[in-house]
Regions:
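Long extracytoplasmic/lumenal interhelical loops at the membrane interface
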Residues: 270-280, 284, 292, 296-335
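A membrane-periplasm/extracellular boundary helix in multi-pass inner-membrane enzymes
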Residues: 133, 211-212, 232-271, 284-292, ...
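Transmembrane alpha-helical segments and their membrane-water interfaces
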Residues: 21, 43-52, 78-132, 371
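N-terminal signal-anchor transmembrane segment
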Residues: 1-49, 71-81, 369-371
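Perimembrane helix-loop-helix junctions
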Residues: 42-50, 221-242
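Alpha-helical transmembrane segments of multi-pass inner-membrane proteins
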Residues: 19, 116-150, 162-233, 353, ...
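Transmembrane alpha-helices of multi-pass inner-membrane enzymes
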Residues: 36-42, 177, 181, 362-374, ...
Length: 411
């Protein structure tokens, strides 16, 4: 028994690396990574020894407390739901909101040092790079099957048929920021080698984000690039800064010139100026629905039925996607302003922590996640729930104080 426990304890670090690697991978790998981590913590005995006091866990300044509370409210919301089948499926999708922070409470502190946290970030960067490379190669192969190369095959939905572009774009933006600030000390190579690796990855992420043509991705990578340029000029890497700026401008110009023909987005209609106005009208109608039941909402299981009826009554479009296209509104429809308050509290607590530690680059990453939630019901899909849950736990760990006063390099 002691041998099994010792062996399991040695597997905790590889399991966490695997979890980071699987964040951007298909759902099967996400589920397997969480299950393996839970089993390893159980076999090692760590699952019986919480590493935080009750005061730390239930601290109102703890953003993970509000994240877990949000899930509990979704569970309570089942009490006034009539569609229990949909509600149970929804709770299953949202399970990582409480499961991942719960497991996080039992991870030994030696596995949450700054050095190891950056290794987990490197695993995430590796995973997203593999996914993007696979999508790009698949798109190029599809494009070459035509008589003349079809550039649309590596644009937007054609590039990511199995992945939602906005989710993939958000993960790529975060990966770009993490790549620039990642010390990469564990690679044990020269500074020039590290610069080359970072430059190649960041340029690759920039190119793929432009190809994805996601509004969230466009804003996110603009923020990421500005942060990178600011730090390059601040460190007086003038030549590298101008080379990077020239690459970004040239990249945007080239892809823009090659993709002038309109193509269809996920709502099944070509890009035009009416999309934004229709979306604003859509939000206005949802707010009217919320006003009818603002405190408790309509219940965790009845959200889809309420929005389906709204689509039918108002005849708004978006016929294939029966959600609010905004996580803050979606949460309010489901469990009222109490749920909205919990979701907002998660971001406010994180923002205060990161601002206090002067981790402004990570604060920008948090803002990009918030932007995703303002344009997508990101906690209604496994891709969004899984990514956000791990991202929040990583941000909490990286912003914790410790005796050695470890700090993030360059941030």
């Amino acid at each position: 028994m002691k041998t099994l426990t010792t062996f399991a304890q040695r597997l905790i670090f590889p399991a966490l690396v695997f979890c980071g690697f699987c964040i951007a991978l298909p759902p099967f790998f996400k589920s397997i990574s969480i299950m393996l981590l839970a089993l390893i913590l159980l076999a090692s005995g760590e699952l019986f020894r919480c590493k935080y006091t009750a005061k730390q866990i239930f601290d109102l300044r703890n953003p993970l407390f509000w994240l877990a509370t949000l899930y509990i409210l979704y569970c309570i919301g089942m009490l006034w739901s009539s569609n229990t089948a949909y509600g149970m499926m929804d709770l299953q999708i949202k399970l990582p909101l409480i499961l991942i922070p719960f497991l996080f409470c039992f991870i030994p502190r030696e596995y949450l040092t700054k050095k190891r946290l950056w290794i987990y970030a490197s695993a995430f960067i590796t995973g997203i790079t593999i996914v993007l490379s696979y999508l790009l190669i698949s798109g190029i192969v599809r494009g070459m099957q035509a008589e003349t190369f079809n550039f649309r095959s590596i644009m937007y939905c054609d590039l990511s048929k199995k992945y939602a572009p906005n989710y993939l774009a958000t993960e790529t933006c975060i990966a770009a920021i993490l790549t620039f600030f990642n010390p990469l000390k564990f690679l044990r190579i020269s500074n020039k080698g590290i610069i080359i690796i970072k430059s190649c990855l960041i340029c690759f992420f920039n190119t793929l984000l432009i190809l994805l043509d996601s509004r969230v991705g466009s804003i996110g990578i603009a923020v990421a690039d500005l942060i990178i340029l600011f730090h390059l000029f601040r460190k007086r890497n003038i030549l590298l800064a101008f080379l990077f700026l020239a690459y970004v401008i040239g990249n945007v110009a080239f892809v823009g010139a090659m993709s002038r023909l309109p193509f269809e987005r996920e709502i099944g209609q070509p890009i035009d100026g009416k999309h934004e106005s229709r979306l604003v009208n859509y939000y206005n109608v949802i707010t009217k629905v919320i006003v009818k039941s603002p405190i408790l909402g309509y219940g965790s299981g009845d959200t889809k039925d309420v929005l389906t009826k709204m689509h039918s009554d108002e005849q708004i479009g978006f016929k294939r996607y029966l959600n609010a296209h905004n996580q803050f509104l979606q949460t309010t429809v489901a469990i009222g302003v109490l749920g909205l308050a919990c979701l907002v509290a998660v971001f406010v607590c994180f923002a205060l922590r990161l601002w206090k530690r002067k981790y402004f680059a990570l604060l920008a990453g948090l803002a990009i996640i918030g932007l995703l939630m303002m344009t997508e019901s990101s906690l209604e899909r496994q891709a969004g729930v899984h990514f956000c849950s791990f991202a929040f736990c990583w941000l909490y760990a990286i912003s914790c104080k410790n005796k050695k006063k470890e700090r993030i390099e360059q941030v």
